[in-house]
Curated annotation (Swiss-Prot):
InterPro entries: GATase_2_dom, Ntn_hydrolases_N, PRibTrfase_dom, PRTase-like, PurF, PurF_N
Binding residue positions for Mg(2+): 294, 356-357
Full protein name: Amidophosphoribosyltransferase
MF terms in GO: 4 iron, 4 sulfur cluster binding; amidophosphoribosyltransferase activity; magnesium ion binding
Family classification: In the C-terminal section; belongs to the purine/pyrimidine phosphoribosyltransferase family.
Alphabetized Gene3D superfamilies for the sequence: 3.40.50.2020, Glutamine Phosphoribosylpyrophosphate, subunit 1, domain 1 (3.60.20.10)
Length: 476
């Protein structure tokens, strides 16, 4: 569904390259391919081997770099970031990469995808020790930990600092002479490494490699730190306490269909989810349609499995200005009609299966069901290609309270009545794992299922949780 309307948003995307004369330009194109991961801000920091130069701003990547600013960022290495704010707010000071300059130790740039669940505790400790924070972003915590580390080399300072962090993080760190890549011990966020000639490329999604012409090498492993400089790439471990738990929503919703995560194509996974959904809850109907864009693959899979024709029953308007999209519920509801239209010629007089990837608040689903009925659909059967999202996420998705999750307090039947569908079905957790290609009976399935099951792969600290949801979360 539409991220801006739906209220289900990912924090950001990161891209980095080392060893190319046009590193900032390539980073620009890489970030453009990751724009779906964040639209509130973008930035690029580059190094020429002696100094770091940067430009960043609020808005889309094309808005931030529109008046020749890109030509001012020069170097053979660069890291970039597109942001959706889930921690710290969306102000300019929080736009990444964050750049820290020191007369004694040189400069350091940080780009981060994820969310640190112990950031509040660490920040308080650092402030008690005299650290002064310039932003409200949890990313800045790492910079202060590095600065205060007692280790001699930057590599050891970073490894020591990373060992103190809890939560989800895919970090790109750049100095004048090297780029360092790190992924949390659970591997909650995707991060891949590739090659572009002799240059090393790192990105949140493999679709960025295709756009810039890079060749995929492998995934960055959980607990792994890569040190990339003019001498090549070296891999080290900063944690041996590994428990791979890739966010399931990356397959269901966030990532582009042409990306691969852990060797699994996102489009194929979503199509399989639709097939599993058909196995679990088929219904008699005349036409299947998907809510664009992220649900189309699942809808195709559902149609193939049931033999019901797939049709383009909903159209997305791609030219609604971003300034319209606001976080208020009233504008979010009105936004559905501006962003989506039902195709009367497809759905009129038909029993329609509407496939969507998830339900968060239920508001958008209700509006779309109403839209289909107004276009003449005689029945609307809603099929969701994921289990009910009943628990908050603290790892970088903008769902931090139970109150904003309708499945947290409503049964499936109550949700069906709320959205006005004839029937409503969610995919089971078992169906989700099988669709992605994981073993359901595996004690470590490789996926984070916390928003469905309430079982979090890391400790959840009290200050991470808003007071009115502490008790519910901390007892899981």
């Amino acid at each position: 569904m539409l991220a801006e309307i739906k209220g289900l948003n990912e924090e950001c995307g990161v891209f980095g390259i080392w060893g190319h004369e046009e590193a900032p330009q390539i980073t620009y194109y890489g970030l453009h391919s990751l724009q779906h991961r964040g639209q509130e801000g973008a930035g690029i920091v580059a190094t020429d081997g002696e100094k770091l130069t940067a430009h960043k701003g609020q808005g889309l990547i094309t808005e931030v770099f529109q008046n020749g600013e890109l030509s001012k960022v020069k170097g053979k290495g660069a890291i970039g970031h597109v942001r959706y704010a889930t921690a710290g707010g969306g102000g300019y000071e929080n736009v990444q990469p964050l750049l820290f300059r020191s007369q004694n130790n040189g400069s350091l740039a940080l780009a981060h995808n994820g969310n640190l669940v112990n950031a509040t505790q660490l920040k308080q400790q650092l402030e008690n020790q005299g650290s002064i924070f310039q932003t409200s972003s949890d990313t800045e915590v790492l910079a202060h930990l590095i600065k205060r580390s007692g280790h001699f080399t930057l590599k050891d300072q970073i490894k020591n600092s990373l060992s103190m962090l809890k939560g989800a993080y895919a970090f790109l760190i750049m100095t004048e002479t090297e780029m360092i890549v790190a992924l949390d011990p659970n591997g909650l966020r995707p991060l891949s490494i590739g090659m572009m000639g002799d240059a090393y490329v790192v990105a949140s999604e493999t679709c960025a490699f295709d756009v810039v012409g890079a060749t995929y090498l492998r995934e960055v492993e959980p607990g792994e730190m890569l040190i990339i400089n003019d001498e090549g790439m070296k891999s080290e471990r900063f944690s041996m306490n590994i428990n791979r738990s890739i966010c399931s929503m990356e397959y269901i919703y966030f990532s582009r269909p042409d990306s691969n995560i852990d060797g699994i194509n996102v489009h194929s996974a979503r199509k399989n989810l639709g097939k599993m959904l058909a196995q679990e809850s088929a219904v008699e109907a005349d036409v299947v349609t998907g809510v664009p864009d992220s649900s189309i693959s699942a809808a195709i899979g559902y149609a193939e499995a049931t033999g019901i024709p797939y049709e383009l029953g909903l159209i997305k308007n791609r030219y609604v200005g971003r300034t319209f999209i606001q976080p208020s519920q009233a504008l979010r509801e009105q936004g559905v009609r501006m962003k989506l239209s039902a195709v009367r010629g497809v759905v009129e007089g038909k029993r329609v299966v509407m496939v969507d990837d998830s339900i968060v608040r239920g508001t958008t689903s209700r509006r779309i069901v109403t839209m289909l009925r107004e276009a003449g659909a005689t029945e609307v059967h809603v099929k969701i290609s994921s289990p009910p999202i009943a628990h908050p996420c603290f790892y970088g998705i903008d769902t931090s309270t139970h109150e904003e999750l309708i499945a947290s307090s409503h049964s499936v039947e109550e949700i069906r009545q709320e959205i006005g569908a004839d029937t409503l079905s969610f995919l089971s957790v078992e169906g989700l794992l099988k669709g992605i290609g994981r073993k359901y009976d595996d004690s470590n399935c490789g996926q984070c299922l916390a928003c469905f099951t309430g079982k979090y792969p890391t400790e959840i600290y009290q200050d991470t949780v808003l007071p009115h949801v502490k008790e519910a979360v901390l007892t899981k």
